[in-house]
Swiss-Prot record:
An example Gene Ontology biological process: phenylalanyl-tRNA aminoacylation
Residues given in the record as Mg(2+) binding sites: 247
Cofactor: how bound: Binds 2 magnesium ions per tetramer.
Subcellular location: Cytoplasm
UniProtKB keywords: Aminoacyl-tRNA synthetase, ATP-binding, Cytoplasm, Ligase, Magnesium, Metal-binding, Nucleotide-binding, Protein biosynthesis
SUPFAM superfamilies linked: Class II aaRS and biotin synthetases, tRNA-binding arm
InterPro entries in UniProt: aa-tRNA-synth_II, aa-tRNA-synth_II/BPL/LPL, Phe-tRNA-synth_IIc_asu, Phe-tRNA_ligase_II_N, Phe_tRNA_ligase_alpha1_bac, Phenylalanyl-tRNA_Synthase, tRNA-bd_arm
Species the sequence originates in: Deinococcus deserti (strain DSM 17065 / CIP 109153 / LMG 22923 / VCD115)
Stated name of the protein: Phenylalanine--tRNA ligase alpha subunit
Uppermost EC category: ligase
């Protein structure tokens, strides 16, 4: 029996075949198991010798099973590794290259320019209260910007900020002049969506406050931004305009030599000298917090512009809605230009 069992074990080519041999000989109803079960029928004087003989056979079969199982498992592992082998000399799969979204790239360009001029870059809450968004910025209750049709109002009386200017108020309340900041973030307007308008868009806004700050300082700052964004040949044009939180106010445009042709004036944003009423509102808020009134008598300028407009003009994007379509076929076109 021992020789027959070992022969069948060595002939097994798979683990399933080996298991069948194991069941045949040492399973619950196997040949060796039955021999052990029949020992009780033997006379006592034969039982011990026969039991030792059967145990020797059992041990030999178990040893052969263990050895053959190891051989078959190693063979199976080798076969699997061979089938899954990777030729490391083959070229790898190309990884899709990412790139900055056009708006993010314009943001990075703008904030980089102002950081080099010593500005701190800050952000603020997108949900604002009416006072910080309007009243403190010299926008009284009867101003058209307070119309319910132009603003996203929340049930608790708060609103989605319509510009990044409220952060100027918050920053001045918490900090003393002199100061130089740019505020970046999303703003919201309740208006119809078309190729040039979205209900949500981005702004970058700057504020400088100190002693003796003049319109000449503002013009120099805008000119430096234009040169940093469009090159050393960029020229800046200012035209009078009205904004309730600055006086005097102006719109500014940049002459851009477009490498695609069609060089033209690009209207980028608005600016002006901070209105005295804004400083007065800041001091009122500071006084309510037990802080000294320090802004009345100071001078400063503010400016604001939209990254979407800059990106649309610079990269020839015809529809603002493309920025938010999340279509990689659209955004991927600008990967090379945007770095």
């Amino acid at each position: 029996m021992q020789q027959q069992a070992i022969s069948e074990i060595q002939a097994a080519e798979t683990l399933d075949a080996l298991q069948a041999v194991k069941t045949k000989y040492v399973g619950k109803s196997g040949l060796v198991t039955r021999e052990l079960g029949s020992l009780g029928k033997l006379p006592p004087e034969e039982r011990k010798a026969r039991g030792a003989e059967i145990n020797t056979v059992r041990q030999a079969i178990d040893a052969a099973l263990t050895e053959r199982e190891g051989v078959l498992k190693r063979a199976a592992l080798d076969a699997r590794l061979a089938s899954e082998a990777i030729d490391v000399t083959l070229p790898g799969l190309p990884l899709p290259a990412g790139g900055l979204h056009p708006i993010n790239r314009v943001y990075e360009d703008l904030t980089g320019i102002y950081e080099r001029m010593g500005y701190a870059v800050i952000e603020g809450p997108e949900v604002e209260d009416e006072h910080h968004n309007f009243e403190a910025l010299n926008v009284p209750w009867y101003h058209p910007a307070r119309d319910l049709q132009d603003t996203f109002w929340l049930e608790d009386g708060r609103l989605l900020r319509t510009h990044t200017s409220p952060m100027q108020i918050r920053y001045m309340v918490d900090h003393e002049p002199p100061l130089k900041i740019v505020v970046r973030g999303k703003v919201y307007r309740y208006e119809a969506t078309d190729a040039t308008h979205e209900a949500m868009f981005h702004q970058l806004e700057g504020l400088v406050v100190g002693d003796g700050i003049s319109m000449a300082d503002l013009k120099g700052t805008i000119a430096e931004m234009a040169r940093g964004l469009y090159g050393p040949s960029a020229k800046v044009r200012f035209q009078p305009s009205y904004y309730p939180f600055v006086e005097p106010g102006a719109d500014f445009a940049v002459w851009w030599d477009n490498p695609r042709g069609e060089s033209k004036w690009l209207e980028l944003g608005g600016c002006g000298m901070v209105h005295p009423n804004v400083f007065r509102a800041v001091d009122d808020l500071r006084e309510a917090q037990g802080k000294p009134r320090i802004y009345e008598g100071k001078t400063g300028f503010a400016f604001g512009l939209g990254p979407e407009r800059i990106a649309m003009l610079k990269y020839g994007i015809p529809d603002i809605r493309y920025f938010y379509a999340n279509d990689p076929r659209v955004i991927g076109q600008f990967r090379g230009e945007l770095g």
